[in-house]
Every structure is written in C-alpha cells, then in structure tokens.
Amino acid sequence: MANDTRQVVQGVQEMTPSEAFVETMVANGVTEIFGIMGSAFMDAMDIFAPAGIKLIPVVHEQGAAHMADGFARVSGRTGVVIGQNGPGISNCVTAIAAAYWAHTPVVIVTPEAGTTGIGLGGFQEARQLPMFQEFTKYQGHVTHPARMAEYTARCFARARDEMGPAQLNIPRDYFYGKIKCEIPLPQPLDRGPGGAQSLDAAARLLAEAKFPVIISGGGVVMGDAVEECKALAERLGAPVVNSYLHNDSFPASHPLWCGPLGYQGSKAAMKLLADADVVLALGTRLGPFGTLPQHGLDYWPKNARIIQVDADSKMLGLVKKITVGVCGDAKASAAEISRRIDGMKLACDANKAERAARIQAEKDAWEQELTDWTHERDPFSLDMIEEQSKEEGNWLHPRQVLRELEKAMPEDVMVSTDIGNINSVANSYLRFEKPRSFFAAMSWGNCGYAFPTIIGAKVAAPHRPAVSYAGDGAWGMSMSEIMTCVRHDIPVTAVVFHNRQWGAEKKNQVDFYNRRFVAGELESESFAGIARAMGAEGVVVDRIEDVGPALKKAIDAQMNDRKTTVIEIMCTRELGDPFRRDALSKPVRLLEKYRDYT
C-alpha cells in the first residue's frame, strides 16, 4: 500500500459521498473498523482497504461495538463500529450503552433504509436514531449526500470532545452520486485546568488538610494524568485510592497506592478514605454504585471537604456534596494545583511520616487478610464447599484462583472483566502498573462484555498481553467471538470461571429468598472443548497449583505463537456478597397460596 493512500485530499474536490465518508475517517486517524459487512454501506466498504482502513469482521455486532470500545480505551483514539441497517444496528445497542457509561469515544455508523422507502415498512427498516438517544453524546443524521463529510467529521469531534459515543446515521442511498466538498480536518480541544478561582480554592483546602486523600478516577486514565496525580500525591503524602473499576488509574507498586473502592474493593482504601478531612476526587464522577458501603464499612467521609475535578461540569456535585468543583482536564488541573501548593506551608507536612506508616500498616493488614481469605465463609458457601467435596471432580475456591491469577500476571497485561460474582470479587486482586490496562462494563454492567472488549484492546496494542475474565453465564454470551480471534489472527487469553450458575443473581436468592433457586443453574458442556472445536486452545484447570502456570503458558502462546487460549477453571459454587443489599427487601406475601414463599 502506498503511503499516499493515508493523505487526505485537500481543498474542495469532486467526489462521491462514499469517498467523502472514507476520506473523513482517514482524516480522523481511523485504521480499523469493527462490524459485519452489509449491502447498506458496501459502496464505501469497497474503498476501505485502499484508504488504509481494515474492516475486522465479527460474529455478532454487539461484539463489534465492544471491540470498538476496548480499542478506544487502550489507544486513546476513536473506536468505530458499523453494521447493516435494522437488525445489524439494533444488535449494537447494549454495547454502545456500555461505552457511554465508560465515557469511551466511539462512533457508531448506522446506515439506514433508503430515503425513497423510509416509512413504508420495508426490508430491515427501523427508526435507528431513537434506539441510541439515551446512550450517545451526539446523533448526526446525514440530510443530504453533499453533507456526508460534514456530519462524519462532527460525529468524530463530538465523540472525542464529549468523551462518549456518537451516532452517524446515513440513508443507504446517500453513499452514491457526485458531490463537491472539502474534507474537514480535526480540531483538538484544549480543555485546560479549570478556572483560577476554583483552583485557588482547591489549593487552599489542600494546604489546610491534615489527612488528605486522593481518589484517582477514569479521567486520570483518559487524560494521561497518572504522573501529575503521582506528583501531587507525593507532595501531600496523600494515600491514593482508585475509583471503582479504574484500578489502572495509579500504579500499584507505588507506596501511596491503596487499592480500589467499590464492590469487593480494598479495605485499606476504604479505612483511609473514611478518615480523610479533605478529599481530592480527580477525574471521577463519584458514581453512586462505586461508593456504596462495602465489607461492612460505610466509608464515605461524611464531614470531609470534597474537591471534585471533572472535565464535564454536569458531573460536579451530581452524586456527592462537594466543597469545590473544578471543571478541567485531570492532567492540567493536577499540575496546576501542584504548582499552586508548591512553596505553601501545608498542614499535612507535620504528620507525613505518621501518615506514611498508617498507609503501609493498612495495606499490609489488607494483603494479609486477602492471603488468609481462601474461601467465602457465609453459611451457603460453606454448605456448597461441603456438598462439592462429595461430588466427582475437583473444585477450586474462587478467591484462591483469583490470587494465583494475580501473581501470574505480567506487568504489561491488559485485563477485562465481565459482570458476575467471581468477576466482581476480582476487584480485590487486580493491580496494574500503567494506565489503559483495565476494562469493565462500569455502571451498565452487561454480561458478555469482557471477551470482545479485550479483543478490541489487543487490536489496539498487539504488543501487550490481553486477558479476559468471565463466568460461565456471561461467557455463553460472547464465546462465539473465539472464531473472530482465530479467523483474523487476534490472539488473546480468556479465563472462564466454571461454577455452573448465574452467581450474582443467585446470591440474592440465597440472602432474600430462602435459597429458592429459579433459573440460576447452568450445567454446561466443556468450554475448553468448545474452544478447541473453534480452532483455539482449550485447557481445563482443576488444581490450584496449575492456575498460575496455565495462565503463563497461555500468555506465552499468545505472545509468541499467536494462539488464543480458553482456560476453563473449575470452581466451587461458593458466592461473595450480593452487589446491592439496598436494592432488595425480604419478600412479603399477602395471598394465602403464596404465604410459604417468604
């Protein structure tokens, strides 16, 4: 391919709308698109390759949109997904919602029915804009072929600038014809650190703080602000906790790192945050689910003064009461706050050594607790352990499995986790040294997220090891994408926790419905065998001493032999805490025939 194929045409030119569409994507740095081929955009697809764009075909369009999400989160570029009008597009809705809640810049291109047939109920016709209106930052509908480049460019700009998905809706007949237009070039947005008044106020609060704590959120990752966060933390001697499911927002080897908040997060992080007199929430919206009580700790500091930094002003004070709100880029804001406190007399300097000792003590205690916490200790889990000791086969404790996986992870690894009980318990064990390493479905929490997302991440960073976690329930929704890995030489490693149940929801039946189990059991065939049938490697692990070596061998095969491996780990049916005790109540039955169901 000649290098000049990536050179965007300059000035007003005569071209087709398909050419305008493709040239605008080239101008925005697009090199990969995820999706399934379709007649609705075939004229444009025909010139993807000469433009230096690769269409990566998938098994299901939901997987394509998740791949675009993972690609964007690793690369820092805009992910792109495309599909056939109607059912191909509706298949993307769930994954675009996940990208929305992860603040991921993704452009979903939605070709639709031709203009002469709209409203007649034709083949694969649908009103596609309403499908995505809740989960996009911007929806562009091409109203005339001559405006193809304009709308395409605007969707990329909005996705990038507003940190979320944008929809580009194109009537399929608008790809054809002749137009005259100029290809718009992207204009990067300089967000800046925030207003001087709010930054001054933040610096004053931190100067007065005796026990400051920093919450490092997704904005630190997306804004490449880890070094600035680190410098500020070191100046303050402040413990740094990761916001929920942003475990890669601060290096785990740093002495001030204390682990994640949220479900199954770090007790050290929670105990230290509970004692804060000033909290700097850097690049986080302080989401409600990620700050719920956990481990019996209602840890949010009710009397602390809160400084919240977010690039989206709508997030400031939305969930938690704040003292100072800074609307700014996390990187620029952290650097500017550091500059302001440089040379100031800080109250926390007086107890820096004492606080450092406390931080280390809390971390040591939590690490020891995790080491000793080999299995769940609630009555149901103990019953399951006893029951399965009498069954054929060998079943491993999930917590021990997660600990062994943690120890075997390479430093440069990327990990995605699905929703579910074991996957969420993994929050205690996932530690990272660099940003853009950890991906989860965030507040959307959809099953089937992890595997396609890590495929997209691997496309963006083929030099990095890529590992996904899924339970056997969620795995059933996405395992068909093994064929995508094999067909298109995208090697990844998938860990499947085979405990034969929908664990997260079943835990609610344990705690609230007297162990009346409905639709929660999942007796499954061999996932390793299915993987082998699809052309990948498949390994069954049922001894704890084999967990780490199996992961290391699979990653070696991924990186050196370009092999995709599914590691099926046979786990007991023990279960961690329910996600939300506040979301359910003990049942009340008023009709006589249901009285026993309490």
UniProtKB/Swiss-Prot annotation:
Keywords, comma-separated and alphabetical: Acyltransferase, Cytoplasm, Magnesium, Metal-binding, Thiamine pyrophosphate, Transferase
InterPro entries per record: DHS-like_NAD/FAD-binding_dom, Sulphoacetald_Actrfrase, THDP-binding, Thiamin_PyroP_enz_cen_dom, Thiamin_PyroP_enz_TPP-bd_dom, TPP_enz, TPP_enzyme_TPP-bd
Catalyzed chemical reaction(s): acetyl phosphate + sulfite + H(+) = sulfoacetaldehyde + phosphate
Pathway assigned in UniProt: Organosulfur degradation; taurine degradation via aerobic pathway; acetyl phosphate and sulfite from taurine: step 2/2
Signal peptide, first to last residue: none
CDD domains assigned to the protein according to its UniProt record, in alphabetical order: TPP_PYR_POX_like, TPP_Xsc_like
Family of the protein in this entry: Belongs to the TPP enzyme family.
UniProt cross-references to PANTHER family, sorted A to Z: ACETOLACTATE SYNTHASE CATALYTIC SUBUNIT, MITOCHONDRIAL (PTHR18968:SF13), THIAMINE PYROPHOSPHATE ENZYMES (PTHR18968)
Broadest EC class assigned to this enzyme: transferase
Membrane-spanning segments: none
Subunit structure: Homotetramer.
Protein name from the UniProt record: Sulfoacetaldehyde acetyltransferase
UniProt record, GO biological process: isoleucine biosynthetic process; L-valine biosynthetic process; taurine catabolic process
GO molecular-function terms, A-Z: acetolactate synthase activity; flavin adenine dinucleotide binding; magnesium ion binding; sulfoacetaldehyde acetyltransferase activity; thiamine pyrophosphate binding
Subcellular location: Cytoplasm
Temperature dependence: Optimum temperature is 30 degrees Celsius.
Cofactor dependence: Mg(2+); thiamine diphosphate
Species of the source: Castellaniella defragrans (Alcaligenes defragrans)
GO cellular component terms, A-Z: acetolactate synthase complex
E.C. no: 2.3.3.15
